């Protein structure tokens, strides 16, 4: 019974694995306008965004003997979490759709998976291309943007058979 989830779960955690750039051969380059736009869009909703300067650089995979000419060596997780507090518990019981739960959790100030990934891109851990391969960066955190996305007055329970 999905209504018991809210009272029995403490934390919801999502993860994706990105390949880690090889420290021996990764190559830096200044941000392009397109890269800066993608990063700025994602960071716009970040609760404590890293500073993006004119001198900020990104790194790309190159390939060498250490990484078997792939440009990557190892994997690391990008994460997002939702603490199940009273607001999230109520959302899970009322309407357990992802966008409703994330909207209820927004006040927690926990970075989204895209935001965590961008932090790893800016630190040189992985490349923007690699992050885009595993995480949808087109919208940052899923948020309600129109009335059509909001739950109806009847809520989810009225549609359960």
PLM region spans:
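Short, flexible helix-loop junctions that flank or precede catalytic/ligand sites
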Residues: 1-161
């Amino acid at each position: 019974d999905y209504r018991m989830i809210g009272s029995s779960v403490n934390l919801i955690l999502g993860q994706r694995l990105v390949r880690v750039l090889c420290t021996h051969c990764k190559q830096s380059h200044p941000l392009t306008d397109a890269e800066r736009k993608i990063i700025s869009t994602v960071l716009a909703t970040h609760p404590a965004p890293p500073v993006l300067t004119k001198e900020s650089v990104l790194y790309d995979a190159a390939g060498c003997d250490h990484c078997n000419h792939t440009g990557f060596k190892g994997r690391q997780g990008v994460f997002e979490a939702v603490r199940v507090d009273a607001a999230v518990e109520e959302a899970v019981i009322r309407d357990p759709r992802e966008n409703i739960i994330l909207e209820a959790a927004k006040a927690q100030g926990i970075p989204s998976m895209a935001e965590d990934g961008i932090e790893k891109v800016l630190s040189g851990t992985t490349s923007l291309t690699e992050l885009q391969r595993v995480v949808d960066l087109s919208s940052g955190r899923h948020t309600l943007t129109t009335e059509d996305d909001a739950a109806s007055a009847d809520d989810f329970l009225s549609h359960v058979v």
